[in-house]
From Swiss-Prot:
Its EC number is 2.8.1.4. InterPro entries: Rossmann-like_a/b/a_fold (IPR014729), ThiI_AANH (IPR020536), ThiI_fer (IPR054173), ThiI_N (IPR049961), THUMP_dom (IPR004114), THUMP_ThiI (IPR049962), tRNA_STrfase (IPR003720), tRNA_sulfurtransferase_ThiI (IPR050102). The gene is thiI. One of its GO terms (cellular component) is cytosol. It holds the Pfam family ThiI_fer. This is Probable tRNA sulfurtransferase. Pathway: Cofactor biosynthesis; thiamine diphosphate biosynthesis. The lineage of its organism: Bacteria, Bacillati, Bacillota, Bacilli, Lactobacillales. GO terms for biological process: thiamine biosynthetic process; thiamine diphosphate biosynthetic process; thiazole biosynthetic process; tRNA 4-thiouridine biosynthesis. Belongs to the ThiI family. It is an enzyme of class 2 (transferase).
Length: 405
């Protein structure tokens, strides 16, 4: 079936009032970026929906890209026909012959934006439904929950037919809610937090701490590969590498074992906050889930958050681990996340970290290290790259990956 257009229906944009045009403009930019390889198509954003005119470009490829664009509620590949009833009947019959099977049910659903057309919606439903029923007696008309809904849209320029409604990614257009920094480890939770953050319209930059020689190149590349899994939702993501070796060594040497984790996290948060300020971010996001590990009790969060007044947003804070894992599998980050490459969150991990660290003691022990000097030297070594669609960083050999898992 040769589709001529894809009709895109907006998600939460319909609730955004006077900001609606800004949101549509942002979505238009994101769709344009997602479809940049398709040179023939044209995108026409309207107030109530977006029309992507294919001009011969591959519909299936475009559909696959659109599935990942946040801000789209659903979309329908459509066929344009002339504004006469015979053309509509001919195209509708060909479409139904291709998709219909004996015993299936159908109905016709017409939407008319051009009220000057000689048939209203009910008349078109009856006329076209009756014709198809006569021509295809093996199909049965059914108004409630039919197998096939043939949608007819009557516009001033043409009439459009479709039989599919494909669910989009939902959410808000990425960038419409500002920019934030995501603290990305190599685990399961933070990539899921990144996905959920993007879905709420926040453009994210990844902040990843690495500690060579204690962490390997594979650990760093794993974090980049996890970032690449989220790129289809946005088109490109900045990846910020922050050297953390000296800080971890100094904290381990100077701080009681039970407070190692707390003070390391405070240093990570300070660094992320300074990077955020320099790069005009508005908030910090992470993959913490309340009570999941020692650093994620409310007492630990309070002791760690003490170093900044910047909003810390935790998209998976109230989720069970199984809920997080399900999302990780859906977005294809789970298998990567469980690859056994240690990141800096797991090295030097004390056997019995404080689950309820005392804030005054935390501040006291932290005075044993030169916080400002350590932060300054780490920031000098920060490296920023952009990860784009198709970038690969780990060995893609399936047998090697299977052995790691």
């Amino acid at each position: 079936m040769q589709y001529t257009e894809i009709m895109v229906r907006y998600g939460e944009l319909s609730t955004k009032g006077k900001n609606r045009n800004d949101f549509i403009g942002r979505l238009n930019g994101n769709v344009t970026k997602a479809l940049h390889e398709y040179k023939q198509l044209r995108i026409h954003p309207k107030r109530d929906r977006m029309h992507i005119i294919l001009n011969g470009d591959d519909a299936e490829g475009v559909i696959e890209r659109l599935r990942h664009v946040f801000g789209i509620q659903n979309f329908s590949p459509s066929i344009e026909v002339n504004r006469d009833l015979d053309s509509v009947k001919e195209t509708a019959l060909a479409m139904m012959k291709e998709i219909g099977k004996p015993g299936m049910t159908f109905k016709v659903n017409t939407r008319r934006s051009d009220h000057n057309f000689f048939l209203d919606t009910n008349d078109m439903n009856r006329e076209l439904g009756g014709y198809l029923s006569d021509e295809l007696p093996e199909l049965e008309v059914q108004m409630k929950k039919p197998d096939i809904t043939l949608r007819v849209e009557i516009r001033q320029d043409a009439i459009y037919l479709t039989n599919q409604v494909i669910q989009g990614a939902g959410g808000l257009p990425v960038g419409s809610a500002g920019k934030g920094m995501l603290m990305l480890s190599g685990g399961i939770d933070s990539p899921v937090a990144g996905y959920l953050t993007l879905k709420r319209g926040v453009d994210i930059e990844m902040v990843h701490f690495f500690s060579p020689p204690y962490t390997s190149d594979n650990a760093l590349n794993k974090a980049k590969e996890l970032t690449a899994k989220l790129v289809p939702y946005v088109g490109g993501i900045k990846f910020i590498e922050v050297p953390f070796t000296e800080i971890q060594e100094e904290v381990k040497h100077s701080v009681p074992e039970g407070y190692l984790m707390t003070i390391q996290r405070r240093m990570m948060l300070r660094l992320t906050d300074q990077i955020r300020a320099k790069r005009q971010g508005l908030a910090i996001f992470n993959g913490e889930s309340v009570g999941q590990v020692a650093s994620q009790t409310l007492e630990s969060m309070m002791a760690i958050n003490d170093v900044t007044t910047t909003p810390i947003v935790r998209p998976v804070a109230t989720m069970d681990k199984n809920e997080i894992i399900e999302i990780a599998k859906d977005i294809d980050t789970y298998d990567l996340s469980i690859m056994p490459f240690e990141d800096c969150c797991t090295i030097f991990a004390p056997p019995a970290p404080k689950t309820r660290p005392n804030l005054d003691k935390t501040r006291f022990y932290e005075q044993r290290i030169d916080v400002d000097a350590l932060i300054e030297r780490s920031l000098v070594g920060v490296k920023v790259t952009e990860i784009k669609a198709g970038d690969q960083f780990l060995n893609q050999d399936e047998e090697i990956i299977a052995e790691l898992l």
